[in-house]
């Protein structure tokens, strides 16, 4: 089995012009490969003993082009040093833009996750992949290990530009020690705690166990989302600003020079997803308010036209069209002969509901003065808190106005569903069968003649009444699906505003190394080389992985509302509901499942301060 030696390009280029003999010094632990940290001249090592985990892996004679390796069957792997300052790092697995506790819930199948976990624990997979992962951890902390080596052996040339003290760092350290800075930090601490406490209290009230308002209102859910984001900001900031990770590497190497398990817990890249999620959320909030300012200005200029047009459209859709459809259903629509008595009864019932709802609240809500006041409120809301709040308020307003359609759909679907169940039971009776509820099966049964006659008469009556009930049911089902489509489309717009991976896309275009999607190792051996040479490269994350929550959201929408299962529900008369909480759960992937309490929040802020 070859011994892999990871060489940084910077070290190769810095020492390629040197003519004298050289010695390459590397670090390696029990579960890692060799990683070259620097080179020096041999005379510096004559009076110094190199202690583990450091060792000499190669030497170079005076004027020689190649290296003489001290290990058997060496294999060189060249890599470029990741810049910790710019949050570049290597990762064998694609970086996750989702909180780990939400990963299992977003998988299409929990069984797939369990199978992958079992495969990951296989000895062969664990042996090969673990060694490479631990080596990548050393590479990611390469400047820190170089600093630790340079402090122990100052004569060794290492590449540690990222850790050299600068004047800016000195000025920042001096400013942080002044009284003014401490006073401002104290004020910021208490101000942050008060804001987060209010947000946490509001979120707790909206998610009260006995009556969760977030399940019934899009506007309330938007408030809850923003409150949870505000509460989670300090936690994300505290995670991404830990500076003890790099500084303690040298002491940890001295304490435990045979094991590298500590390196994973000291990896700064562990919290890079929080960095991306934090600034992505901040950018989206700023863009949300920007869109609100732009669209609010447009709405102000066209307010009179929008009010009059909205009044006409809403009156036609919620009153005139409903009344026309209901009256048409009572008069044999499309030449289909319906049961006159049942059609007139249902038509008069629905017409009474239409008139009652219109005179009670719809007429007042769609009045031009009311619409003008509501539009003004929406515009001010756009200016203050963003476009998403205005859209969510419009969704709730539309849901209130379309409540009569929901009532008609529920009544007709219940009638249709009950009629189908009764007809199925009577058909079993006609065939001499009976449903066994305990065993959930159809058994043969003997019925009396009068039972068969009565069942047959009822079955025939229901068969002749089915076209009438179906006509009302299908008409209001179409209207209900139209309202659901409008609500879902508006919810998708809100989801796009709140959770679009804008910051991640910009990072992907600007610096793909900050969003690793795995690694690739390519062969670089030339004819003059005696040993195999490989090149370690960072593969950027795929765009498909960045939009994975949206793919799951679209899949849920298609499955629940626009699939064969939806058609089957309509045929059976089952209710089609908008489960906003289940639909929107996918897009809460950047937030913890349980909102932070005030006590936990205070602990986080205290640690950060």
Swiss-Prot record:
Extracellular compartment segments: 1-186, 302-380, 473-485
Transmembrane segments: 187-207, 281-301, 381-401, 452-472, 486-506
GO biological process, one term: GPI anchor biosynthetic process
This protein's UniProt keywords: Glycosyltransferase, GPI-anchor biosynthesis, Membrane, Transferase, Transmembrane, Transmembrane helix
GO cellular component terms listed in the entry, alphabetical order: endoplasmic reticulum; endoplasmic reticulum membrane; glycosylphosphatidylinositol-N-acetylglucosaminyltransferase (GPI-GnT) complex
Coiled-coil ranges from the UniProt annotation: none
Record EC number: 2.4.1.198
The UniProt record lists the keyword Cell wall biogenesis/degradation: no
Presence of keyword Lyase: no
Stretches of the chain found on the membrane's Cytoplasmic side: 208-280, 402-451, 507-609
Quaternary structure note: Component of the phosphatidylinositol N-acetylglucosaminyltransferase (GPI-GlcNAc transferase) complex composed of at least GPI1, GPI2, GPI3, GPI15, GPI19 and ERI1.
Function comment: Part of the complex catalyzing the transfer of N-acetylglucosamine from UDP-N-acetylglucosamine to phosphatidylinositol, the first step of GPI biosynthesis.
Name of this protein: Phosphatidylinositol N-acetylglucosaminyltransferase subunit GPI1
The species this protein was found in: Saccharomyces cerevisiae (strain ATCC 204508 / S288c)
